[in-house]
Amino acid sequence: MRVNALDHVNIITADLDGTARFYAELFGLERRNAPPPLTPQNAQWMHDGAGRAIIHINHVDCPRLFDRAVEPGPTGALHHVALNCTGFAETLAQLKTRGLAHRLNEVTAIGLRQIFTLDPNSVLIELNFFGD
């Protein structure tokens, strides 16, 4: 077996609409209904610029085939989600306009600038800007 790429991250939340709005408004991800048997009331998928559903957002009441105890809020074993991005200055301005706490980091050896922020569920979001 060979892993080709990360497919998606799944976030379970009590605020489906607010979480989907966060990813759509701040990162420009396209919000779409998840495929059946999921419903618009229990799941939304966020698509990147290439049309990939990279973030799946499920309401706490959404049925799951393989389940484990999950509570909204602290993220258990998941520490962060990293996204490869463009538009560093625009993203930084949006965070400031929205009053969202964030931290910056640079890894000059590889030409990387990073912005870290939290989503509405306290999931740490790492935004990576290579050469931007």
Task: List the predicted regions and their residue ranges.
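Exposed loop/turn and edge beta-strand positions of beta-sandwich/beta-sheet ligand-binding modules
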Residues: 5, 40, 77, 111
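Core segments of cupin and vicinal oxygen chelate
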Residues: 12-54, 97, 105
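Conserved beta-strand in the GNAT
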Residues: 55-58, 126-128
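N-terminal beta-strand motif that seeds the catalytic metal site of vicinal oxygen chelate
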Residues: 1-20, 78-83, 131-132
